Each structure stands twice: as C-alpha cells, then as structure tokens.
Swiss-Prot record:
Belongs to the PPR family. P subfamily. PPR repeats lie at residues 243-277, 278-312, 313-347. It comes from Arabidopsis thaliana (Mouse-ear cress). Pfam families: PPR. Residues 413-503 form the Smr domain. This is Pentatricopeptide repeat-containing protein At2g17033. Keywords: Repeat. PROSITE patterns: PPR, SMR.
Length: 505
C-alpha cells in the first residue's frame, strides 16, 4: 500500500511515494493513510531527533501507530541521481551471476548454496569481493540476485583470505534492511557493535557508513536508527573529528533521502557546535536541492558557498549542470556555463556528458548513425538556440586539447570516459582541430594517428561499444582511411600522412 508524501519547497510541491507493506490480515484491520502532508520540519526529523523503536516494538510515524506487521521501504518518484553505475563486474563474476540465474537452479536453495560455495572456493579474493560489492550496490544491474548477497558473504567469511570489513558489513546491513530481513540485519549489526564499540573513532566511521548505505538503499528504519546512534555519539564525544564525520554523514544521508532542508538544519547545528561545515556538506545540500528541481534553493547554496570562502570547482559545477539537465532546464544550463568563465572553473569530460545528454536533438540524431551530421558546421544547423549555445560553450573549452596527445610518434584522441553524445561532439571537433594542425606549415606530422574508442569492456552489454560503433560509422561515412587496429580492437589507426591527405584534400 502506498502513501503520498507532499512537501512544499519554495513554492514547488514535491511528491514522494512511501510504500507500506502489510500482510493481508493486517490490512483488514487497519486503513493506511492514502495521503500524508508534511512540512519540512516533520518526516525524517522525527526519526533523527527521537529514539527510534524496532519494528517488533511498533513505530509511531506522523501519528499513525503501526504494529510489528508493518515494514517500511522508502521510494521516490523524483530520483535524479548522477549515476556512476554499479560496481563494474569482472568477467569471471559476470559469468557466475549469469549462471546463478539459470533455470537449473531456480527454486532449489540447496543447489544455489552449493553453486555459491563452489564459486567462492574457486575464485581469487578480488573476484569474490567484486561480485559481493556489485550485489550490495544500490545501482546493481542484477537486483533480482541481490537476495543472495548474504549467502555469498557467509561463504566468503569461511575463506582463508577473509578480512572482516566494517564498510562491507554496513552495506550488507543496509541491503538486508531494504529487503526487510530485519532479524538478519540485526544479527550482523550486533556483531559489528560488539567488535567496534570500544574504539570511538572506528565505531563512528562504521555508523557513518551505515547511515549513508541505508540512505542509498532507501531504508527509513535503518537510516533513522543509525542516525540516532550517531547523535548519541555527537552528544558524548569530545573529539572534533568524530563529530565532524558524524555530521557529514547525516547531511549526505538526508540529501540522499530527499530531505535537503533538514540537511541544512544539520549544517546550522554544526555551526552551533563550533564545527565549520566543509565543501562536502554544501555540495551534498546543493545537489539535494538540484535533483529535486528546487533551483532557487540550489542557487542560494551556491551563493552561500562563495560568501563563506568555498570555491566553486568542476565537481560542484557539474552537479548544477546535472540538476538543470535532469529537469530539461537548458536555458539555465547555458547561463551557468557562461558563469563558469567568471569563476575560472575548467570544464571536464563529465561536463560534456551532463550537458550533451540533456540535448534532445543530439540524442535523437545518434539513434540513426546513418543520417546524423558528420561535421561540426553541419551539426550546428540542426540545433535550436538553447542547444546551439551549449555546444558553443563546450567547444570553447580545453576538454578536446586534454583528450589529445600530439608528437612525432603518435597523434592520439582518447574517448575513454565519454558518453556517446560527448564522443560524437569531441570526434567532430577533433576532425576540425586535426585539419587545422595539418594546415600549419611547421606542424609535426605524427607517424600514426590513433582514435581510442574502447572495445566495450565497460559497456552495458560487454563487448558491444556504442562509442566504437559511432566512430566506425563516421569514419566510413567521411571516407576516412582509419581502420580498427589489429593489435587493439578498441582503437582506430592510420598513417599520419594518410590522415592529412584525407582531411586536407
């Protein structure tokens, strides 16, 4: 059963969905609230500032008393995250997870456990931990298999190379909370507390990981309990380091839970405790507002950062761009790119990715590589005013120069880290730039010209690189002499003089 939570932020109504999972016997006796309205002073603050109770004891939430038959999972319809993706899988681990999904193992817990045991026994430490980390990630590409993370971890603990890792435990506890396996998460938590409670710093860092992991997984109960433990430490600790780390995690966690207003209150509390908020806290709040589309609040935080001596850097500027892009605010994105010149903030590959992934014309063009423009001048004729400004600002930056190596031996363009749209624009820029260099009388002509596209090891489908397909298609359509390198299938190569003849003909 779902409840709608509406919060008003600066005139913008943000609606979230809170899912309440009831057994049928419980729903026959209780009616859930279909709609809940909370101000920025309520909601998660109840969890943060009052002692939480285990579900077995009952939870009172916004006046609704819930018995031990109710479980909580936090979901939002407005998650606009700057996704780095799940932990990349090694090839061996990818094969293992594929086999774990096979029909032969379906519905047979004993067979699955034997399969997991065999995998851990036959795998090196790096591979086994890689698979576990992938399953624990809130961005995992195998969410249907994350249920087996605990079984995998249990087998790993039996390995001779196993070292107890509190960060890994925090991530596993958070996943179990998300899956509403509270007895199992409580067992792991109790063990961790027993091992770490004698060392205040280690225990605090564990709780910090627990707060952030629960917030990423969307577990209200796990987040509130870990936050309450951190508050207890803040109240009794005399260590500035311990208090700072605790506050940082609470700010980050609240922003992950779409509560940037409450996160700002924590920052104010830091000031009262004579602890100076750092750039990390401000970035968290800035992006928390931004991904919710609360741009007035986002810009207010940007201004405050400047007045307090925190320099706007590339990471911060990319957060702003990502926020605008997620809400199709292209005019604001263009204005922000122009402001960055005044801040002397350099662009990065991620700047390209954030901006170009938000340009609908370019994204649409790249769906048909047989008809997309193959020159920068041609591309500009298809763009609307907003997109044309964005492309202009990007092409005036130094990102292309940083992606190029140029000497007598080799002239190389490296497209690693670039999304398809960024690779497209950079490639068009590169052709113009290379042509310009070749036209100079004193230009050094490299023996070889190389374009590195990658072979698809990090693509959504292993071995299928959209960037490689893009480069190949454009090379064919423009009559380029560059061909796939036999020694490196993730690169295109040709003699420098041949490339000069092609571009300067």
């Amino acid at each position: 059963m779902a409840a709608l939570i509406q919060t008003i932020h600066g005139g913008v109504v943000v609606t979230r969905t809170l899912t309440l999972v009831y057994p049928s016997t419980f729903t026959s006796r209780h009616k859930a609230l279909n709609q809940m309205t909370s101000s920025s002073n309520s909601g998660l603050r109840r969890f943060l500032f009052t002692p939480p109770q285990r579900l077995s004891q009952g939870i009172c939430y916004w006046g609704a008393e819930l018995s031990n038959n109710v479980s909580w999972t936090y979901k939002t319809k407005m998650v606009v995250r700057s996704k780095a993706g799940a932990v990349p899988l090694m090839k061996h681990g990818d094969r293992f997870l594929s086999s774990l999904s096979s029909p032969a193992l379906a519905g047979d817990p004993s067979a699955i456990n034997r399969h997991i045991k065999k995998f851990v026994a036959a795998s090196p430490k790096s591979v086994a931990l890689n698979v576990l980390s992938h399953l624990l990630s809130d961005q995992t590409s195998h969410p249907h298999l994350s249920f087996f993370a605990l079984s995998l971890y249990s087998e790993i603990t039996e390995a001779s190379w196993f070292d107890w890792n509190p960060k890994l435990i925090a991530e596993l506890i958070a996943l179990l909370n998300k899956q509403e396996r509270f007895d199992e998460s409580e067992t792991l938590l109790s063990t961790a507390v027993s091992r770490l409670k004698s060392n205040e710093r280690d225990f605090t860092l564990f709780l910090c990981n627990l707060v952030e992991s629960n917030s990423k997984q969307g577990s209200i109960q796990g987040f509130s309990e870990a936050s309450f433990r951190l508050r207890e430490i803040i109240q009794r600790s005399s260590s500035v380091y311990v208090k700072t780390q605790a506050y940082k995690s609470m700010v980050s966690g609240l922003c992950n839970m779409d509560q940037p207003h409450d996160a700002e209150r924590v920052i104010e509390e830091m000031r009262m405790e004579k602890i100076k908020p750092g750039l990390f806290e401000y970035k968290s709040v800035l992006y928390g507002y931004g991904r919710l589309g609360l741009f007035d609040d986002m810009n207010r935080v940007v201004h405050r950062m400047g007045t307090e001596g925190h320099k706007i850097d590339t990471v911060c500027s990319n957060m702003v761009l990502s926020s605008y892009g997620a809400h199709d605010a292209l005019p604001q994105m263009g204005s922000w790119l122009q402001k960055l010149k005044g801040f002397n903030v350099p662009f990065s590959i991620r700047t390209y990715n954030s901006v170009l992934n938000s340009c609908p014309t370019i994204i649409s063009m790249l769906k048909d590589l047989d008809s997309c423009p193959v020159s920068l001048s041609e591309l500009r004729t298809f763009l609307n005013e907003d997109e044309a400004l964005l492309v202009h600002e990007l092409t005036q930056s130094s990102v292309l120069d940083e992606a190029i190596e140029w000497n007598a031996v080799e002239g190389k363009l490296d497209l690693h880290g670039m999304h398809l749209s960024s690779s497209y624009l950079i490639l068009l820029q590169w052709m113009d730039e290379t042509r310009l260099r070749f036209s100079e009388e004193k230009c050094v002509i490299p023996a070889e010209i190389v374009v590195v596209s990658g072979s698809g090891k990090h693509s959504n489908v292993r071995g299928e690189s959209p960037v490689k397909a893009l480069v190949k298609k454009i090379m064919v359509r423009t009559g380029s002499p560059m061909r796939i390198d036999r020694k490196n299938v993730g690169s295109f190569i040709a003699k420098g003089k041949t490339v000069k003849e092609w571009l300067c003909k």
